[in-house]
């Protein structure tokens, strides 16, 4: 099984390198450059447009979009919504990072509006963010996961099962970053043990 996953992953990576897809990113000002560089490193070509007057045209022309909810001020709300809706219209893949979900009432209202009006291909966040998306059962420590939510060898099976059930309910892939990463659809959950404690000391590793 592991060999098959590695082979499939290598083929996907090679395909990205060959096609060099243009990926539209709505990021936050803390990690915009890092996210653009990570897209380049993976073989894609980033565009970071976030003006509401152009995001629909940009998103429709790209191979897919990533919406990062790190900045909910002013025009970002409209830009995220327009980007999400046009991706749904043209049936492009759409990744959503609900940064800080559960941290503040305003941010939660922005989140609810997006989830109500946009379907996401992938929702990825730390465990506290994902649990808030799923059932409002967790409160993030700012944009970091709450200590009591973090995955361990004792709790990872329950987290994986939660991710599968949430994936089925929302009809989306769920990716949870943490000490042990979880990537799940309704049928399977994969655990990735490639993390390091130092990653939590560098801002934006989840965004990337």
Task: Give the role of each language-model region.
Residues 55, 96-100, 124-128, 204-207:
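Short C-terminal domain-edge/linker segments immediately following a structured domain
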Residues 1-81, 86-88, 93, 160-208:
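Small-residue (G/A/S/T)-rich helix-start motifs and N-terminal tracts that mark the onset
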Residues 99-103, 129, 180-181, 196:
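Acidic, glycine-rich active-site loops and adjacent beta-strand->loop/helix elements
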Residues 76-125:
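Glycine/small-residue-rich loop that forms an oxyanion/phosphate-binding "nest" at active or ligand-binding sites
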Residues 107-189:
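Conserved phosphate/ATP/ADP-binding segment of small-molecule kinases
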């Amino acid at each position: 099984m592991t060999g098959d996953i590695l082979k499939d992953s290598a083929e996907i990576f090679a395909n990205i390198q060959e096609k060099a897809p243009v990926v539209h990113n709505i990021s936050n000002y803390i990690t915009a450059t890092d996210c653009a560089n990570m897209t380049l490193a993976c073989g894609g070509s980033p565009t970071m447009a976030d003006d509401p007057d152009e995001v629909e045209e940009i998103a429709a022309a790209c191979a897919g979009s990533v919406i990062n909810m790190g900045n909910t001020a002013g025009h970002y709300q409209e830009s995220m919504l327009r980007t999400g809706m046009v991706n749904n219209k043209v049936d492009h893949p759409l990744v959503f990072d609900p940064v800080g979900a559960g941290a503040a009432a305003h941010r939660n209202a922005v989140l609810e509006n997006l989830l109500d009006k946009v379907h996401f291909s992938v929702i990825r966040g730390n465990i506290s963010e994902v649990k808030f998306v799923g059932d409002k059962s967790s409160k993030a420590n700012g944009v970091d996961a709450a200590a009591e939510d973090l995955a361990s060898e004792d709790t990872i099976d329950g987290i994986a099962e939660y991710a599968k059930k949430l994936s089925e309910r929302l009809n989306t892939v769920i990716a949870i970053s943490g000490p042990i990463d979880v990537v799940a659809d309704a049928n399977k959950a994969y655990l990735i043990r490639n993390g390091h404690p130092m990653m939590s000391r560098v801002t934006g590793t989840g965004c990337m």
